[in-house]
Amino acid sequence: ANWTNAVGFAMIEYAKFKVGGTVVDEQNGLWFDIQNELTDPNKKQWPLVGKVDDPLKLKYFQTKSTKYIIPLRFSFNKSPGQALPIFLTGTDKTEFEIEIKFRSLNNLLLHHSGGTVNTASITEFKAHATYYSLENYETTRIRNYRQTREYNNGQLIHLIETVQPFTFNSGNIVLDD
């Protein structure tokens, strides 16, 4: 058995981005795959998500564990200019969540010999993100003027000064069958 093509995208039934408990964007694995087809002409992300250009490559029995890196392309994170200003969302809460529902692994396996595989599992899940924060005076200025950019002599000035990368780790993943 082997994973279906683009298994990284196929395993995502949906991914929701929530701010203060409210869903502000929701995508599914098929849409992530379509976005990849439209925005990755050189196929650089294909190895990251288990995607191949020839379906015959999926006929080989896979016995090794694999690692996939799945970019979650929500509407606000395609480029830094589309970043979501959380403090302008109308809520005092700055908490945000990403909720991901995975498909059953049995639906992601290709069985070419008619056999079954009972050992497929997700053993680890990590989410990586970059969080940008503004200085207090910048936040106040943006709230007052509702402008996220300024132009000086035709050049764009970015207001973001602090970058804080973080990693979320989850030990146990529960999949719906």
Explain the meaning of each model-derived region.
Residues 1-177:
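Short, low-complexity Pro/Thr/Gly
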